[in-house]
Amino acid sequence: MSRHHDMLDRKRGRKTTAASGADVRARLREIVGAENVLVDPERVEPYAGDALKEKFPPEAVVLPASAEEVSQILRLANERLFPVTARGGGVGYTGGAVPVDGGVVVGTDRMNRIREISADDLYVVTEPGVTTYALQQAVEQYGLFYPPDP
């Protein structure tokens, strides 16, 4: 048994941790707002896997809008000992964004602002939820392009 005190929820086919507790979910709702805590199976399913197609449904998906909210979520996870998986676009092939230990997925969907574009110095400052497409569209206005892969 891991330090997260998890067990397999055979009914739902996923691990359960302290993140399933009503008090934890209530606190998560306080942090990010009720509409940004997803627990329905249909709503968490898109966050259960990546391009490899192996699925591990989380107990909840939390969609913070700021670094401060992420900090509060991680503080709660540390206090209550439930696992957290960070997730951007979920298009990787390595399983890094897959919640294999259950717990909570912290989705960066709402953290999608481009903070700064410096055409002279060739850098961009973004939040973690900015999509490649949005970034390409933004830098194109400066006569630049973003080549994400070799």
Predicted stretch roles:
Residues 70, 93-94:
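Short glycine/serine/threonine-rich phosphate/pyrophosphate-binding segments
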Residues 24-25, 94-97, 122:
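N-terminal beta-alpha lobe that positions the nucleotide/phosphoryl donor
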Residues 95-100, 136-138:
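Short acidic, glycine/serine/threonine-rich loops at helix termini
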Residues 1-51, 79-84:
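N-terminal accessory segments
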Residues 28, 52-84, 108-150:
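N-terminal glycine-rich flavin-associated loop
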Residues 101-109:
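Short basic, glycine-rich beta-strand/loop surfaces that mediate nucleic-acid
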